[in-house]
Amino acid sequence: MALDPEIASRLKRNADGLFTAVAQERGTGQVLMVAWMDDIALDRTMRTRNATYWSRSRGEHWVKGETSGHTQHVHSVRLDCDGDTVLLEVEQTGPACHTGTHTCFDADVLLAPEA
């Protein structure tokens, strides 16, 4: 299968054919993680509703939770106004981060919220 041509024509990819994917938790709106996708990963994600990403380090596609069981069921996919980022609204099972935390954005606060 191939990504719907109407969707593919709206995507802006980097030199490697990749674009940013943000996984956001359904219900809370919490940002869980950021990863890379290509057209194949987005097509697979949309067909299966299982979040599929591109690993730059391994040079291959991976389905979130395929080995760990920490899956992301995708409820919706949105394209941002520039066409270079997709937002996945997901139901997360287990931790989203490879470190074992719920989100990849809970460990290192660079600027604390104002009081």
Swiss-Prot record:
Keyword Protein biosynthesis set for record: no
Stored Pfam families: PRA-CH
Function field: Catalyzes the hydrolysis of the adenine ring of phosphoribosyl-AMP.
The protein's name in its UniProt record: Phosphoribosyl-AMP cyclohydrolase
Manner of cofactor binding, per the entry note: Binds 1 Mg(2+) ion per subunit. Binds 1 zinc ion per subunit.
InterPro entries per UniProt: PRA-CH, PRib_AMP_CycHydrolase_dom, PRib_AMP_CycHydrolase_sf
Cited PANTHER family: HISTIDINE BIOSYNTHESIS BIFUNCTIONAL PROTEIN, PHOSPHORIBOSYL-AMP CYCLOHYDROLASE
A biological process term (GO) from this entry: L-histidine biosynthetic process
Entries under HAMAP family matching the protein: HisI
Residues annotated as binding Mg(2+): D80, D82, D84
Gene label: hisI
